[in-house]
Swiss-Prot record:
InterPro entries: Ig-like_dom, Ig-like_dom_sf, Ig-like_fold, Ig/MHC_CS, Ig_C1-set, MHC/Immunoglobulin, MHC_I/II-like_Ag-recog, MHC_II_a/b_N. Disulfide bonds join 111-167. Belongs to the MHC class II family. The gene is H2-Aa. This is H-2 class II histocompatibility antigen, A-S alpha chain. It is found in: Membrane. The keyword Disulfide bond applies. The lineage of its organism: Eukaryota, Metazoa, Chordata, Craniata, Vertebrata. Residues 222-233 are cytoplasmic.
Length: 233
């Protein structure tokens, strides 16, 4: 199929339901970013940014009705397919910081997990091999064009050269959990020999500058002297 070119793309009313576990979601997206979703437990609309909810509104009952329809349809399709399960795909994860890393300055780590199918996954943050729950937020499942899903998990943190981080991904398509490692890249300190060489080069450049400057001054004085002509007595 030919791709359709557009300046902006809105995906409205994406409904997902699967069993077992009564897992479902209803989302709205714009240009690949989540706008809002309906929380099944709280039965309310959750906006990605609170400011969005001040501009417009969405009745969560509409999303809950769509999910109920998805649940009913899934039961019919399961019987027709003789309960044949979907193929599990292996997701792919990448970890990167939101902003350039400066030690001691607050930042956010992002774990981007793509090619998720079916949309059931556990994403866990580890700091120095220990689970971290404070400062963690993740999006709902966002739809890809090939009908797989992606999800982002965020961790607010303060970079330190003593800490290392891992994003742990667990999914039915993986034989074992996948750990994506991240740690701040700290420039290695210069050795004494390197510092000595740098200082020597700096001193040499300075001396050359002094010599060249002195030569130019002398030449300038000589040129000024030869250009003078004695006046009449």
């Amino acid at each position: 199929e030919d791709d359709i070119e557009a300046d902006h793309v809105g995906v409205y009313g994406t409904t997902v339901y699967q069993s077992p576990g009564d897992i479902g979601q209803y989302t709205h997206e714009f240009d690949g970013d989540e706008w809002f979703y309906v929380d099944l437990d709280k039965k309310e609309t959750i906006w990605m940014l609170p400011e969005f909810g001040q501009l417009t509104s969405f009745d969560p009952q509409g999303g809950l009705q769509n999910i109920a329809t998805g649940k009913y349809t899934l039961g019919i399709l399961t019987k027709r397919s003789n309960s044949t399960p979907a193929t599990n795909e292996a997701p792919q994860a990448t970890v990167f910081p939101k902003s350039p890393v400066l030690l001691g300055q607050p930042n956010t780590l992002i774990c981007f997990v793509d090619n998720i199918f079916p949309p059931v996954i556990n994403i866990t943050w580890l700091r120095n091999s220990k689970s971290v729950t404070d400062g963690v937020y993740e999006t709902s499942f966002l739809v890809n064009r090939d009908h797989s899903f992606h999800k982002l998990s965020y961790l607010t943190f303060i970079p330190s050269d003593d800490d290392i981080y891992d994003c742990k991904v667990e999914h039915w398509g993986l034989e074992e959990p996948v750990l994506k490692h991240w740690e701040p890249e700290i420039p290695a300190p210069m050795s004494e020999l390197t510092e000595t060489v740098v200082c020597a080069l700096g001193l040499s450049v300075g001396l050359v500058g002094i010599v060249v400057g002195t030569i130019f001054i002398i030449q300038g004085l000589r040129s000024g002297g030869t250009s003078r002509h004695p006046g009449p007595l």
